[in-house]
Swiss-Prot record:
Residues 455-470 have a biased composition (Basic residues). Binds 1 zinc ion per subunit. Residues 282-583 form the Deacetylase sirtuin-type domain. Residues 14-27, 75-116, 172-201 have a biased composition (Acidic residues). Residues 1-148, 164-201, 455-482, 619-655 are annotated as: Disordered. The keyword RNA-binding does not apply. Its cofactor is Zn(2+). It is found in: Nucleus. Zn(2+) binds at residues 417, 420, 441, 444. This is NAD-dependent protein deacetylase HST1. Keywords: Metal-binding, NAD, Nucleus, Repressor, Transcription, Transcription regulation, Transferase, Zinc. GO terms for biological process: heterochromatin formation; phenotypic switching. Residues 620-648 have a biased composition (Basic and acidic residues).
Length: 655
């Protein structure tokens, strides 16, 4: 088996598709591997500031079962001889098995397609976690031996020792079967991803990143390393290649250029290679905004994925921006603002949630022009499904049919009693939410009053340990406290049917997505950063040939959209509708105000980046408003300066 310091790349791809379908025993004999090991004597190669280097002449290509824990050059030579003998035997076996493999080929391909659809070995299950940074998942994992595990992507298997988890763990896999919201799980995961997507560095332009990634995907890992790493590869070479793949290591090593750093950066490079292989490749025939418009006009089964950005124009805050909901509740003193949506915390003290729930309460029966755009797709029989992360239920106000809508995180549409399950229309508890009061279940309240009428003394008590549902009081406490009845703090509390951390996802999500990935012909991602599972992993489940278009205020670097239309969601939707003609006029009262009365005079488009295919949709009206606001602020600052005070002193408070 590989030594503790060895990183082994296994190329399980081959010219014949049948070779990939052999059973595990044969596969272990036929796989080709490339072993990365630091050069034990760097003085024999070129000296680079006396740093350790990786000599590619020490990389051995041998059958996996011939790799020993010692990795000496003598063993490598012996392994090469064994490889030649085994290759001859393999050729004879392949000739004998060729006819049988051809007969089985159709059946195997059908099984592979079914596996991809169902999210089994080849593709990820929709329940699998993605890391908290929103980076796409690399692959599932399959055991190779008792001491190793492998990661399979596009026919290339990367193997590491189980006792070295830095590379494997960076995949952020969680093998649990629960359906809890993955975002919180990932935030608490100690094995966080060691890479972050970043196109901001000046040294490497996006065009070179795209070229490097394309070569890797088209030619495989072995040829990629031969082309992009020199014969004696140093740490500098490895780091440069990581950057050239479009990633920056999250953590910097402090040990200088010693052997430990070399091995660590090799692992990070391996991780980058895996990620690139998992990223969707942009289609070469869809590159311009006109291509995007034609797709929207002609597609018949459009999947729309939406987030908080489609509702911010109505005054509903997003969650993660500097002025978003989580920033607004810092005063609660929670270790993590997301805890307001933690089920255990809600059961122990529902007051915390209801003290801030009014801030995210949806407005009464209004919706944005972007919601009208989705409704228009539905009216034209083009909407396959709208998968929304929003809990405001504004889609229903816009007229989107229930069968065309999946509310992935639940919504305020209904509310349920956490004790007896009694369900009501969500708007019934809106008055209590607006008043920062806890709404209670009428049925459980009757039970409570009935107990009180029996003359028993009642006392509200909050406990850390969650009580069972349908149990109005604790019998043990009653006996211990001489007849006193203790009601749990959350007894009979009504809770909006929002999916809290600790609750299962809506069942209709799983059913719908497994159907829709086989029907969709266009994906529109609108108003979301795609950082929260399960919605974040949908784009990775869609077949690569299906076009993907982004409509968002900011670009998303960890996904490869064919075209990105950047700007405020209402402006982008209005631009699309205006360009497609009168039959696409949005059924919203603000549509003409946004686009301008004279055929879209307020809206303009600008190409930002031809390589990334990013376009900016801007609105003159918004620009004028911003300019007026800036002028107003500038005038106020000038008045403050003339009065001899600094701006932050104007309120009488010292900075």
């Amino acid at each position: 088996m590989p030594g503790d310091n060895d990183i082994v790349l296994v190329d399980s791809s081959s010219d014949n598709e049948e070779e990939r379908e052999e059973d595990d025993d044969d596969e272990s004999q036929h796989r080709e591997i490339k072993k990365f090991k630091p050069n034990p004597n760097p003085s024999q190669t070129r000296d680079m500031n006396e740093s350790h280097v990786i000599n590619k002449s020490n990389f051995s290509t041998v059958p996996f079962n011939a790799v020993s824990s010692s990795s000496s050059s003598d063993n490598d030579q012996d392994n090469d001889e064994e490889e030649e003998e085994e290759e001859e035997e393999e050729e004879e076996e392949e000739e004998e098995e060729e006819e049988e493999e051809e007969e089985e080929e159709e059946e195997e391909e059908e099984e592979e397609e079914e596996s991809e659809i169902n999210g089994n070995q080849i593709s990820l299950s929709i329940d699998d976690e993605y890391d908290s940074e929103g980076l796409t998942k690399e692959s599932s994992r399959t055991p190779i031996g008792s001491n190793t595990s492998d990661i399979i992507i596009n026919g290339v298997t990367i193997i590491t020792n189980n006792n070295d988890s830095s590379l494997v763990a960076s995949s952020s896999d969680d093998d649990d079967d629960d359906d809890d919201d993955d975002d919180k799980d990932d935030d608490n995961d100690d094995d966080a991803s060691d890479l972050e997507s970043d196109f901001a560095f000046e040294e490497i332009p996006p065009s070179l990143i795209m070229e490097t990634r394309k070569y890797l995907k088209q030619n495989g890992t072995m040829k990629f390393l031969e082309k992009y790493l020199p014969t004696a590869a140093s740490i500098e070479n490895i780091i440069k290649l990581i950057l050239q793949l479009g990633f920056v290591p999250k953590r910097k090593l402090n040990n200088g250029l010693d052997e430990n750093d070399i091995m660590e950066y090799i692992k990070i490079l391996n991780h980058a290679i895996i990620k690139v292989k998992s990223i969707r490749e942009r289609r070469e025939d869809i590159t311009t905004i006109n291509d995007a418009l034609k797709l929207i006009e002609n597609s018949k089964n459009i999947m729309v994925i939406t987030g908080a950005g489609i509702s911010t124009s109505l005054g509903i805050p997003d969650f993660r921006s500097s002025q978003g909901f989580y920033s607004m509740i810092q005063h609660l003193g929670l270790s993590d603002p997301q805890e307001v949506f933690d089920l255990d915390l809600f059961l122990n003290d529902p007051n915390i949630f209801y003290s801030i729930a009014h801030m995210i309460l949806p407005p009464n029966h209004i919706y944005s022009p972007l919601h009208s755009f989705i409704k228009l797709l539905q009216d034209k029989n083009k909407l396959l499904r709208n998968y929304t992360q929003n809990i405001d239920n504004l889609e229903s106000y816009a007229g989107i049919h229930k069968e065309n809508l999946i509310q992935c995180h639940g919504s305020f549409a209904t509310a349920s009693c956490i004790t007896c399950g009694y369900k009501v229309d969500g708007e019934i508890i809106f008055p209590e939410i607006k008043n920062k009061e806890i709404p209670y279940c009428p049925k459980c309240n009757e039970v409570k009053q009935s107990i009180l009428k029996k003359g028993k003394k009642t006392k509200s008590k909050s406990k850390k340990k969650k009580k069972k549902k349908n149990k109005p009081y604790d019998d043990d406490d009653e006996e211990e406290e001489e007849g006193e009845t203790y009601f749990h703090e959350s007894f009979g509390v009504m809770k909006p049917d929002i999916t809290f951390f600790g609750e299962q996802l809506p069942e209709n999500f799983k059913i719908a997505i497994n159907q829709d990935i086989n029907k969709v012909d266009l994906v529109l991602v609108i108003g979301t950063s795609l950082k929260v599972a399960p919605v974040a992993d949908i784009v990775g489940k869609i077949p690569e040939h299906i076009p993907q278009i982004l409509l968002n205020k900011d670009p998303i670097n960890h996904c490869q959209f064919d075209v990105s239309l950047l700007g405020y969601c209402d402006d982008v939707a209005s631009y699309i509708a205006n360009e497609l003609g009168e039959s696409w006029d949005l059924p919203h009262p603000d549509y003409n105000k946004i686009r301008g009365e004279k055929n879209g005079e307020n809206l303009s488009v600008q190409l930002l980046d031809s390589t990334l295919r990013e376009y900016l949709i801007s609105n003159k009206k918004n620009d004028l408003s911003s300019e007026q606001e800036q002028n107003k602020m500038g005038e106020e600052n000038r008045k403050v300066e003339e009065s001899g005070r600094r701006p932050n002193e104007s309120g009488g408070k010292s900075g």
